Each structure stands twice: as C-alpha cells, then as structure tokens.
Amino acid sequence: MEELDGEPTVTLIPGVNSKKNQMYFDWGPGEMLVCETSFNKKEKSEMVPSCPFIYIIRKDVDVYSQILRKLFNESHGIFLGLQRIDEELTGKSRKSQLVRVSKNYRSVIRACMEEMHQVAIAAKDPANGRQFSSQVSILSAMELIWNLCEILFIEVAPAGPLLLHLLDWVRLHVCEVDSLSADVLGSENPSKHDSFWNLVTILVLQGRLDEARQMLSKEADASPASAGICRIMGDLMRTMPILSPGNTQTLTELELKWQHWHEECERYLQDSTFATSPHLESLLKIMLGDEAALLEQKELLSNWYHFLVTRLLYSNPTVKPIDLHYYAQSSLDLFLGGESSPEPLDNILLAAFEFDIHQVIKECSIALSNWWFVAHLTDLLDHCKLLQSHNLYFGSNMREFLLLEYASGLFAHPSLWQLGVDYFDYCPELGRVSLELHIERIPLNTEQKALKVLRICEQRQMTEQVRSICKILAMKAVRNNRLGSALSWSIRAKDAAFATLVSDRFLRDYCERGCFSDLDLIDNLGPAMMLSDRLTFLGKYREFHRMYGEKRFADAASLLLSLMTSRIAPRSFWMTLLTDALPLLEQKQVIFSAEQTYELMRCLEDLTSRRPVHGESDTEQLQDDDIETTKVEMLRLSLARNLARAIIREGSLEGS
C-alpha cells in the first residue's frame, strides 16, 4: 500500500488575504473559483465586501500552450497504439514494440522542445522569452528522465551494453560539444584555438575516442615536437577495449582485455611519458579513471550524471545494473562536494539508478508542472509489467490514478477534452464514472460541439448523459423559438413531458398563424410520435391536413372524428377540430355519415355545456366571446344540414 505523504505544499494565491477565515471555493473539472466572503458592516442595510474579486485558479495551465498542445495531440495517438499492443506477444517481440513506443514518445518530446527553443529565441518580449526558455528546460529534463527509464526499465540492458546505452544517453543530452567542435574545426588553425584542448577533453570524457584521435592528429601535424606522444596517446585511445553492439566477445574476455589496457596506461603514467604535455597527461589520468582528474574537469562535465558515466567508462565498463545505485550516489556526493544540495532532477535520476520506479514517478509528479509525463511513463511501465503489485491507499492503481488526473486536466480545455475521453476509456475501474462526471460539465456552446459530445455518449451507451444533453439542447431551442429542433432533441432524449410541451407550442402556433412550421419533421415522425399523446395528436393532426390537401375527404373525416372521440386531442383544441370539420360538412358530396355527424354533435354539445374549469381559458372564451358563439351556431347549422343530407342519402341507398 502507498504510504501517506506529509502535509501538502501551501500555494499562495496573489491578491487573496489568506488570513481571513471566510473563503468560498467552488471546484470545476480543471479549475477552482475562490473569493472572500467576509464583509465590513458600514450600516445596517449595507454590506460591502472587503475584496470584491473572484479568482480563477487553474491546475493545468500547460494545456493552453499552443506548442504543448502538439505534445498532447501526438502522444495521444501513441498512447492508443500502446493500448492495442497484443497482450499475447511475449519475449523479444513485445520488448521491441515497447522500446519503439518509448522512442516515439521521446521523439515527440524532443520535437516540442526544439520548436519551443526556436520560439524562445524569436520572442520579442523578454518575459515571454524567459517563460519559453524555462519550458525548454522542463522538456529537456523530461526527455532526459524518460531516456534513462527506457534504458533501465524497458530495454533492461545487461552489463556491457548498459554502459553503451548510458554513453549514448549522455552524448544526446550533453550536446554543447558539437557546437564547440564546429567552432574549433572552422578556425584557420584548430590546434592553436583557445578551446582546442577543452574540445579534446570533452570528447574523451564522452568516450568519443575516434574523434579525439582525429583532433590529436591535427596537434601532431602542427607541432612535430609532440607528434610522438600524440601518436602514443592515439594508440591508447584506439586500443581501448569497448563492447560494441555487433561484438560476440564475452564479458570475461572484455574485462581481461580492459585490464591489460589499463595496466599499459598505468605504465605510461609511471614512466612520465606525457610529462612534457600537461594536457595529454591529464587525458591519460582521465582514461585511468582517476577521480581527482575527473573532478578537475567539473566545468566540462557540467553535471554529476556525466561524471558518473565517464567514471564508469574508465573504471568499471562492465558495471552490473545492480551496482549502479552505489556509483550514482557516490558520484553525486563527489561532484557536489557538499557545496550545494541536490536539485529535484538529481533526486529523480538517483531514484532511477536505484531502480525505484515508484519514487521516480512520485518525484516527477511533484517536480513537473503537469500530469502528461507521469501519466504516459507510468502507463508504459505498466505495460512492461513493472507496476502490477503497486496499489494506492484509496483502492485504485497508480497507472489509473495518473491517467485520470491527466484526462481531467484535458477536460479543462475547450478542444483537448476530446483526447481526454480516450484516456478515461482505458481506466477500467473509475474511468467510466469520471467520464460521466466530466462530460456533463462540457459547455455546449454550439450544436456541432453538442453533436460531438452526444456521439461520444451514444457510442458508450451513456443513456442518462444522452438524455441530459438532449434536454439541454431542447430547452435552448425552445428559448430561441426553434420548435422543430426542440422537438427533435426531446424525441432523441425520449422525454415524453418535454415532447408534450413542444407539441403544445406547435399547436398554439398553428392556432395563431393557421399553418405549421417544420413540416418535414412532423411529416416524418414515424414511430417517434408514440412518445406522448400530445405528440401523437400533433402527428395525426398534420396527417389530417395532408389528407385534406390531397382531397381524400372521407379518410380525413374519419381521422378527424377519431381524434375527438378517442380523447387524444386536448379539450382546448376541440373547437379548432370542429372548425376544421366545417369545409367537409359543406362539401357537395356527403362526407360524414349520420352516425359520424351525431358523434360530432355530441362533441360540440359536450364542449359548450361543460362548466368552465380553472385554467381552461378556451371554455371561458367559448361562453363569453361573440365570435365563438357565432362559430357554434355555424357548426350547429352545418351539422344539422349534413345530418339531413346523410339520412336522406342513407335512406335512398337502403331503398335501392
């Protein structure tokens, strides 16, 4: 189980008086609102806040960096690819795939670092330039740590190849030598350049002995007096035993050869062969692994881990992984010499050399400004089966916890939240719940964004979230008087109550305007019209109008009558339906049968005789309004005439 840490670091918010007790906090997915709630009472009726400001505190400001957004976007694809690596792969094939994924992550970090470096150089504002330079340093440290973790935890390099990997690691991250080399070689007389011996020394410190020999040949050409000792030094560099990638010799053979070579170097030192050249003698002491000679080159080494790798190269080139922590700690102590304390980066690298993965992740979580690094590194190490036994004290595992934190930060951004969805998908314990909580807080500014969110929810069968989003969009559409859109969203939400509300608005608009809006939607409701009685009535009433327009009068009359007798039509709409029957009653051909006419009469009498009930304004208007009275009289007259015609017609048909 993970041990509990000590007290968390206190973060002071500029402008907020932390000594006051009354503070209000409100947490969001990626930020927090803070304001003071203490008031100074001036008068009984007036309360004035002492600090009338609301502060927004963001925990992941890096998501708003344009360059770092590329890091997040490109690493997202690598992350998804890693999740799909076949679990059945084992041995070298699986290891090679995991190493390839690690290198892909590093290449993305390096690309962002180089772009950030260019932006820092081009920045006109000094403050921005410093900010970009600081970000470059952070990205550089991230790649440095990741590369070391790749060597120690993913490649798991054994003794021999381990040192070759560490040399490549140092050469990649201590790259000032390349610009220095170009400067020296570009001069008219390289061996007389002020930095010539510094360059040769750095090349030796980095184990680039072939390049160092080439530089010494220039010294030999320019100074015949020292040509002999330069040639001897060159031979020592050439014959130094190093385990190359394609070499088949065993570690024992390498150690024997290295021992003989080391003894030869000792003899040259004892014989004072290079006494006439302090520079060459210093190089010989370095190649003998003399710690004092190495520490004299502190400025050229620049950091303790460069000192560590050089020290191993010339004193224990077949170092075993298990012994690294001893050399790392002693190298750090020797290099700092008690003059300064280790930096956070030093502690992280030291933890890596001690093979303490969890301490590496913990230190990185504290030191780095966002969760990207620890989330992706931990996920990769988890795929290497290195974190299986580590659970956090609150029940989740470390991988999932860090991925959840990273994804939560992405949801604070207006567009990067889409990446966060996939990270939640690959958190089996709490990912689904977290996604549900975060996706409900996404501001649905546009319908296009809403459709994206909706599609994500539907793909994951998040029924409640789908319903909630559709309701929100339906309400927005109603407020904007877009009834067609509102009805569409309420149907999609399967919200019967809201569908009824929108249907009533459609019917009210029809009464006011005499026509329907959004006919295409109403005409194509299909089975969706069964969601609510009012929606069914709306669809069927529109169908009545369509039949009437197509002169299918008998079908239209039957449908109109069924809408009234089935009581599916709202009572407030009966007068409109009866008025719609008037043109059918006045047709030359008898449309309504005698029985149907009686039904219409019963509906009319039921409507006019019923006592007014609170809220039914249509009934009140029916009794009070002269226009409504005229309508009733016209209906009664038309119904009576139609009844007479229907009886005569039906009687004549029976007689024949």
From Swiss-Prot:
- Sites where Phosphoserine occurs are at S223
Q: Which Pfam families match?
A: Nucleopor_Nup85
Subcellular localization is given as: Nucleus, Nuclear pore complex; Chromosome, Centromere, Kinetochore; Cytoplasm, Cytoskeleton, Spindle; Cytoplasm
Q: What Gene Ontology terms describe where this protein resides (cellular component)?
A: actin cytoskeleton; ciliary basal body; cytosol; intracellular membrane-bounded organelle; kinetochore; membrane; nuclear envelope; nuclear membrane
Which residues are annotated as modified residue N-acetylmethionine in the UniProt record?
M1
Q: Name one GO molecular function term.
A: structural constituent of nuclear pore
Q: What is its main location?
A: nucleus
Q: Please indicate which superkingdom the organism of origin belongs to.
A: Eukaryota
Family matches, as InterPro entries: Nucleoporin_Nup85 (IPR011502)
Record keywords, A-Z: Acetylation, Centromere, Chromosome, Cytoplasm, Cytoskeleton, Disease variant, Kinetochore, Membrane, mRNA transport, Nuclear pore complex, Nucleus, Phosphoprotein, Protein transport, Translocation, Transport
> Key word Phosphoprotein present in the record?
yes
Question: Which BP terms does GO give this entry?
Answer: lamellipodium assembly; macrophage chemotaxis; mRNA export from nucleus; nephron development; nucleocytoplasmic transport; positive regulation of DNA-templated transcription; protein import into nucleus
Specify the effect of A581P: In NPHS17; decreased function in nephrogenesis; unable to fully rescue morpholino-induced nephrogenesis defects in Xenopus; decreased interaction with NUP160
Q: What does this protein do?
A: Essential component of the nuclear pore complex (NPC) that seems to be required for NPC assembly and maintenance. As part of the NPC Nup107-160 subcomplex plays a role in RNA export and in tethering NUP96/Nup98 and NUP153 to the nucleus. The Nup107-160 complex seems to be required for spindle assembly during mitosis. NUP85 is required for membrane clustering of CCL2-activated CCR2. Seems to be involved in CCR2-mediated chemotaxis of monocytes and may link activated CCR2 to the phosphatidyl-inositol 3-kinase-Rac-lammellipodium protrusion cascade. Involved in nephrogenesis.
Q: Which family does the UniProt entry place this protein in? A: Belongs to the nucleoporin Nup85 family.
Q: What is this protein called?
A: Nuclear pore complex protein Nup85
